[in-house]
Amino acid sequence: MNLSLSDLCNEAREFSRQESLHNEPTLFGVTDGKAVGTYLEQKFRDYLLERYQFETGNSARGIDFPSLNIDMKVTSARQPQSSCPFRSARQKVYGLGYGLIVFVYDKSDYPENRTARLNISNAIYIAPDRTAD
């Protein structure tokens, strides 16, 4: 089955619910937001690939879901991502030209079993026409 925008949004909510209950040993003690973001992006992409067919993005293309014209961002609720997605003044004024699916998480470490948990508080879709500053 091909991945649709509706599927992406519904699956993001379900993935967030499941991931918020998952204890992950590889994230224990990790404070690098980029590492957490990479982990979550890859896990969500793999989750979707088990259920749907879609074109996966790459660094050269710049967006994670090219067929849907959507990029994925992951940010901490405690320390929101400070990187700017705009590559030009035009994008800042008129928008990125693509939509975003944004996961907002709060990470907790559990020393007793050396795991971490990402409580995903929001999985938000932002339409392309809403991505301007």
Functional labels for PLM-detected ranges:
Residues M1-P66, V74-D133:
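Nucleic-acid endonuclease domains
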Residues I70:
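Acidic/His-rich structured neighborhood in mature extracellular/periplasmic domains
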